[in-house]
C-alpha cells in the first residue's frame, strides 16, 4: 500500500467511530476536538466479527500502543502528535487512549502498515481538518458520508477487491450498517483521548461540538493575550457589543467597528484566516498573530505604535520583535505599513511602558467609531481616571491635532511693551513725583525725603539697583531716584495744574453761555519735567547737631575741638551730597576726589553763612542748632578773626536776599570752583557740567525776578559773591592748617578731616591749585 494513500481527509466527517470495509478499517478519534485525525488501521474481518459476536453488549474500547508491540513495527506516539497539534505537550512516552466501552482483547489483532506510520503525513491531515461541523444526530447520514469519503474503485482496485470479499461475510450481522461495522452507538460516538487531563469546569473540552481553538483571544492577569483560560477564567465563545472584549485582529488587516460596537467581519473569500500551525522538525508550533507572551514578573504591558498603519487592505511587512522569552523559541510579529516605513526610515517605533492595570479595569475597553479613520490601534488601553493618548505620541503636546496653549512671550509681543521703572527697571505703575516709577520706588522716595534719612553706601556708591537688589543699598537707590528726576514738588505742581484745568473748564462753560465774555487762560503753566534745582533740593543734607554741652564753661580749645568733630561729620555728608548731584558721578573717580578735597571748606563755609542768614539774621554764626557762636563767644582768643570772615558770607547773603534755589546752584558751583593746574582727567565733561549749573543759576534768577531787566545785574552780584568765597576759604584753610600742624594747641581732628588735610597740604604749598573765577580782578 502506497504511503500517499494512508491518510486522505474526507469532505464530510463521520460522527461515529466505525471500521469501514473499504481499504481497511477507519477509526475516528476524538471527533469533538478540532484538529483531530482519522486513523485507518488494517484489521482482519474475522477478528472483528468474533469480537462483535462474542460480546455484543461490550461498548468500551481500550487501545494500547506500547513501544514495539504492534507486529514488530515502530509505533508512533499518536497521543503526543495529537496533543501537540492543540498546543499541549504530554510528556509520557507510553500514552493510553481511552475510548467508549469497546476494547480490543489483544494487541496483535491490530496492525498498521508501514506506509501509514508516517507522522509527518498525519500532521498534514490534522492541519487540513481544522474546521469541521458539529456531530450530526442521524447515524445513517454519517455512515453514508463515511462511505462516500472512501476512495473510488478505480483508484484502489486491489484494496477494493480485498475488502469486498470481507463485506460479503459481514452482511446480515447485527451491529452493521451497510457493510460497515459499528464500533460505538450513536450517543457514544466520540473518542476522548484527553480524559486523563484535568480541565476546569468551564473548559470547552467538556462540551460537545466545541473546540478550544474556536475561543476568542482573552485577557488574563499574567499575559496580554492567551489562547487558553486560566484556572479561574472560563472560555468566552460568544460575545456581543456590550461586552468589554478585544476584537479578533487579523494578520494583515485591522478590524472594522460599526457605530453600535459590532465587529464587521470580512468574507472568507477576500481574507484568509491565519494559519494555526507551522512545521518545524518534529513538533508542531502554534503562532498567534499580534500576541506577545509576557513574563510573570510584573503586570507591565508593552505598547507599540506605528503611524500610518490604519489602512485596511494594504499589505504590511512584518517586523520581528526579538528578545521575547518563549518556551518553544517562537518568533512573533508586529504589522506595520511599508509606506510609512519608507517615509520614516530614521524614526524608531515608540514603546511606552504602561503601569499595571488596576483591579477594577482588567478588561479591554470597547473600540468605538466607524469608518477607516476611526480604527483603534493594537495595544491601546484605557484606564479609569487617566487621560488616554494616541499610540503614536508619547505626550499630548506631540500630537498635531492638539494645539499648545499660547505662551506668555507670544502674548506679550502682540500687545504694547510694558513700561519699566526708571529706578529699578521693574514694571512701572505710573508717573510718581514726576518720573515713571514702580510703587515700591515711589514709597521709598517719599519716606526718604520726608524722613530725612542719612543713608550711607557701604561700597563705592555704585551699587546696582534692580528689581532684586534694590533693597540692598538705600543710599544708591535714593541717589538713582534723584538722578531720574524724582521730586516732591512735582506732585504739588500736578495738583496745581489739575486745579487750574478744573477752573479753566468751569470758566469755559460760563463763557459758552455768555459769548461776550473772554476765556481766561493762565499766562504760564509750570513745567512737569523736574529741573536740576528741584533735584538739588531733594539731595540737600539735613542739619547736623554738634552735641555741645552749653552748661560747661566755654573755652577756645573746647569750641575748636567740637567744631572739628562737627566738621568731620559735615564732610561725610558733603561727600554723599556731591555723589548725588546729577552728572558728578560721570566724572573720573580721581577727579571726584580731587574736587572734594579742594572744595570741602567752600561747602562748609557757605552752608554756615546760609544757616546764619536764615536763622540769626547774619548777626550770629549758627554751626548747629545746639552750637551757636554769639558775640560773647567770639571774644575768646583766636576766635574773632575767623568768625569775622564767616560773618561776611552771611551778611552778603542777607544783603542780596538770596533765594533757596539760588543758594543751591551757587553751592554746587562752589564744588566746581577749584581744579588742579594740570586740569582734570575728564576736563571736558567737567566744563560741561559746570556750564549746566551756571545756566541753572540763571534760571533760578529769572524765576525769582521774573522777566526783568535786573536779571543780569543780579547774576553779576551772585557770581561776584562766588569769587569772593576764594579769599574767605583761603584764610580759613590757613588757620586750619596751622592748628593741625601745631601740636601744642592740642586740638583734635577727626580721622576723615585729618586725611583730607594731609592730602591737601602739599597741593596748597606747591601752588597746584587753579581758581575758577567769574570775574577778573
Curated annotation (Swiss-Prot):
Q: Does the keyword Transcription apply?
A: yes
Q: How is it modified after translation?
A: Acetylation by CLOCK reduces its binding to glucocorticoid response elements and its transcriptional activity. Increased proteasome-mediated degradation in response to glucocorticoids.
CDD domains given for it? NR_DBD_GR_PR, NR_LBD_GR
Annotated region described as Interaction with CLOCK, given as residue ranges: 485-777
* Omega-N-methylarginine: residues bearing it: 23
Q: Where is the composition biased (Basic and acidic residues)?
A: 1-14, 151-163
Q: Where is this region: Modulating?
A: 1-420
Instruction: Write down which residues bear the modification named Phosphothreonine.
Output: 8
Cross-referenced Pfam families, in alphabetical order? GCR, Hormone_recep, zf-C4
Please give the GO cellular component terms listed in this UniProt entry. centrosome; chromosome; cytoplasm; mitochondrion; nuclear speck; nucleus; spindle
Q: Where is this cross-link: Glycyl lysine isopeptide (Lys-Gly) (interchain with G-Cter in ubiquitin)?
A: 419
Modification type Phosphoserine: residues: 45, 113, 134, 141, 203, 211, 226, 267, 404
Describe, from its UniProt entry, the tissues in which this protein is expressed. Answer: Within the infant and adult hippocampal formation, highest expression observed in the DG granule cell layer with moderate levels in the DG hilus, the CA2-CA4 pyramidal cell layer and the proximal part of the CA1 pyramidal cell layer. Moderate to high expression levels found in the presubiculum and in its' superficial layers. Weak but specific expression detected throughout the entire corticle mantle. In the amygdala, moderate levels were detected in the lateral, central and medial nuclei. Moderate expression levels were present in the PVNh alongside the third ventricle.
Output the InterPro entries linked to this UniProt entry.
Glcrtcd_rcpt, NHR-like_dom_sf, Nucl_hrmn_rcpt_lig-bd, Nuclear_hormone_rcpt_NR3, Nuclear_hrmn_rcpt, Znf_hrmn_rcpt, Znf_NHR/GATA
Note down the stretches annotated as region Hinge.
Answer: 487-523
Start-end of NR C4-type zinc fingers: 421-441, 457-481
Q: Where is this cross-link: Glycyl lysine isopeptide (Lys-Gly) (interchain with G-Cter in SUMO)?
A: 277, 293, 703
SMART domains listed in its UniProt record? HOLI, ZnF_C4
Sequence ranges of Low complexity compositional bias = 134-150, 394-414
**Region (Disordered), start-end ranges:** 1-21, 130-182, 394-415
Q: Which SUPFAM superfamilies is this protein grouped with?
A: Glucocorticoid receptor-like (DNA-binding domain), Nuclear receptor ligand-binding domain
Q: What remark about domains does the record contain?
A: Composed of three domains: a modulating N-terminal domain, a DNA-binding domain and a C-terminal ligand-binding domain. The ligand-binding domain is required for correct chromosome segregation during mitosis although ligand binding is not required.
Entry protein name: Glucocorticoid receptor
| Source organism of the structure | Callithrix jacchus (White-tufted-ear marmoset)
Gene name linked to the record: NR3C1
